[in-house]
């Protein structure tokens, strides 16, 4: 690409970047979906996590350095010199220099040309020969050296993608572009990080895909937070990849390569709503960039990158923004950042400075902070299997002593995922998921969601030996209901008010904002309750349970009655002729009847009983338009909740078509959120 083309591409990218309003900061620190059960697990839970959750054995740590070069000889000399002068502590380190192929300007303008007549007099090939002569003669004393001169021009996307395939779980790749300069301490530092966070089981987490030497330069999501790390240690985790010296871990990189090949074979694009990477795809540089693909993959898998928190003028790697390069001035993020941002006056850390700033101190992983693409802190691993663990989680999610609890038991994984993406779009992130013990639910905790596992162990703790006499054929469903009720009871005893909803109840609006401040003033209109109404609405939509002594008393009596009823075949006299006989629906009807019989106000609020009010509307899946053509004349904006009852008995394609037509389908073909939202 000539200088004129490069500047046009940079200008276009910068204009799009500024117009979209994304938060760029130089770092200063103080389709058709296959929804079968096996595909759900495969798509939602990364294979490396489901196959192994333990650290690799520290047998033979090995690093291969991959230098990506094209047409900048002076840059390459500076980069290789800094690598050669680094301290490797006597380790054997491989060096691979990957030189992209030079092509004539004319052939770049004519992609139909398959055979090119090369002329030694052209500046392009002349520069290539000069670079090749230099790298051939470059002395590397720390291990084997290999030079790869591409037979075809790959550009930065191809150079990065095809740079490495790990030979084993102990091989790590350190990839640098030719305009990066390294500190003498970079290898010792990376080895220390890998030793601490890859080989020590207590610090190992399969969600970590690598280590970046640079200070993060960009929050790629619209409306993202400033790049401010509120941590005392030297390290933090951030989802964004950094390419001013990036160490890659073997397992996540293999996953990425396989995923990338699959996407390219299907002619897919790395679209992710709310991200600056979408604007890059529309620029002259878009097809040459690999970062949009990797960002999409990281979002899909929920992976993170280790970063180093240094002083504003210190660095383990420096990017020099040299003109030229393989695709217009380097590969990190896009050229506009390099050309327009005011880079700090960085200096490479010396040995003495490393001692003064405690560079070698590695905190336990549990003390390190995690940040997503919005640079919003993520609380990973919030999973409760006991009442004590539940108490700790509630303190992290409560808002004004109120907790939103979401029952996801027996709800299909893709329905739960769609609900989560919808909540993100509404700005709701503080809630607790109640789930059965399956890999998908546990993986949600790894991704930062608060999860309570309704397991046999928890049922024993909450219900004691009383549950042992329940008919085994009914035990699972009824036990999950009883544990749910007991979890709510535990939350009430801890002093919190409760909103209780279901993951198969789609919220069209933020109902906490609409009704949150009104619930304590609302009273149940007994005359307006029709006991023959659709019973699902009493537990699948939205319940509000205030905190009072009377409520706790009623809740305990409800569980006790159902334990007794579950042990016998006698019908519950309170349910009478109501059109429900057993299961969780009966629980909520029982509670409703008990509250109506009581003379005291037990603090029970059920939004479904207020359907007579025009400002509340709950509909079912069949009420949604069947396709987009019908949807043009239909609106769900006046609806508050869409109940997805009976999804398991319907064709997934029909459900998806209806939700999509109503604007309620928020996940893509890989069951990942289509859009990233950074609302507070």
Kindly label every feature range from the protein language model.
Residues 1-46:
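N-terminal signal-anchor transmembrane helix specifying type II single-pass membrane topology
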Residues 81-94, 102-104, 422-430:
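Short, acidic, metal-binding catalytic loop of nucleotide-sugar glycosyltransferases
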Residues 101-171, 436-494:
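Active-site-proximal specificity loops/subdomain of glycosyltransferases
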């Amino acid at each position: 690409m000539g200088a004129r083309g490069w500047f046009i591409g940079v200008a276009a990218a910068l204009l799009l970047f500024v117009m979209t309003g994304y938060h760029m900061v130089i770092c200063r620190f103080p389709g058709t979906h296959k929804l079968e059960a096996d595909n759900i697990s495969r798509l939602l839970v990364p294979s490396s996590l489901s196959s192994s959750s333990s650290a690799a054995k520290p047998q033979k740590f090995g690093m291969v350095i991959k230098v990506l070069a094209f047409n900048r000889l002076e840059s390459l000399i500076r980069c290789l010199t800094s690598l050669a002068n680094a301290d490797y502590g006597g380790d054997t380190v491989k060096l691979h220099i990957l030189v992209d192929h030079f092509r004539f300007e004319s052939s770049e303008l004519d992609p139909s040309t398959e055979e090119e007549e090369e002329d030694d007099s052209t500046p392009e090939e002349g520069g290539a020969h000069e670079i090749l002569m230099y790298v051939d003669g470059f002395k590397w004393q720390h291990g084997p050296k290999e030079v790869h001169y591409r037979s075809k021009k790959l550009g930065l996307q191809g150079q990065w993608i095809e740079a490495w395939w790990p030979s084993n779980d102990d091989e790590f790749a350190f990839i640098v572009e030719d305009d990066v300069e390294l500190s003498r301490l970079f290898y010792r530092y990376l080895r220390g990080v890998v030793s601490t966070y890859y080989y020590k089981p207590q610090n190992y987490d399969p969600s970590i895909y690598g280590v970046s030497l640079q200070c993060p330069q960009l929050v790629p999501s619209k409306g993202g937070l400033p790049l401010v790390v509120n941590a005392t240690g030297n390290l933090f985790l951030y989802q964004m990849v950094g390419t001013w010296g990036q160490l890659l871990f073997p397992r996540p990189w293999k996953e990425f390569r396989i995923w990338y090949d699959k996407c390219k074979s299907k002619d897919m694009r790395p679209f992710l709503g709310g991200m600056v990477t979408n604007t890059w795809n529309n620029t002259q540089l878009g097809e040459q960039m690999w970062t949009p693909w990797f960002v999409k993959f990281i979002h899909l898998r929920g992976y993170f990158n280790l970063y180093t928190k240094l002083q504003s003028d210190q660095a383990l790697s420096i990017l020099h923004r040299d003109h030229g390069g393989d695709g217009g001035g380097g590969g990190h993020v896009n050229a506009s950042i390099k050309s327009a941002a005011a880079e700090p006056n960085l200096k490479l850390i010396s040995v003495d400075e490393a001692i003064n700033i405690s560079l070698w101190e590695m905190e336990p992983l549990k003390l390190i902070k995690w940040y997503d693409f919005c640079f919003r802190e993520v609380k990973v691993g919030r999973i409760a299997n006991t009442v004590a663990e539940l108490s700790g989680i509630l303190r992290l999610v409560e808002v004004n002593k109120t907790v939103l609890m979401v029952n996801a038991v027996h709800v299909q994984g893709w329905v739960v995922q769609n609900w989560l993406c919808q909540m993100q779009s509404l700005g709701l992130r503080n809630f607790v998921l109640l789930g059965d013990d399956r890999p998908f639910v546990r993986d949600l905790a790894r991704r930062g969601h608060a999860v309570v596992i309704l397991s046999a162990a928890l049922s024993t703790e909450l219900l004691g030996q009383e549950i042992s006499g329940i008919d085994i054929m009914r035990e699972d469903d009824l036990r999950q209901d009883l544990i749910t009720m007991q979890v709510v009871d535990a939350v009430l005893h801890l002093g919190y008010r409760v909103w209780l909803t279901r993951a198969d109840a789609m919220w069209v609006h933020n109902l906490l904002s609409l009704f949150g401040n009104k619930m304590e003033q609302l009273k149940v209109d007994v005359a307006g309750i029709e006991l023959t109404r659709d019973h699902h609405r009493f537990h699948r939509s939205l319940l509000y349970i205030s905190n009072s002594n009377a409520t706790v008393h009623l809740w305990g009596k409800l569980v006790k009655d159902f334990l007794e009823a579950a042990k016998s075949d006698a019908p519950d006299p309170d349910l009478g002729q109501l059109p429900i006989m057993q299961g969780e629906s009966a629980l909520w009807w029982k509670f409703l009847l008990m509250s109506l019989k009581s003379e005291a106000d037990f603090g029970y609020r059920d939004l479904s009983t207020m359907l007579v009010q025009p400002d509340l509307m709950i509909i079912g899946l069949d009420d949604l338009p069947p396709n987009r053509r019908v949807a043009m004349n239909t609106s769900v904006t006046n609806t508050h909740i869409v109940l997805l009852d009976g999804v398991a008995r319907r064709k997934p394609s029909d459900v998806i078509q209806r939700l999509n037509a109503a604007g309620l389908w928020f996940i893509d073909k890989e069951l990942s959120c289509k859009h990233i939202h950074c609302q507070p």
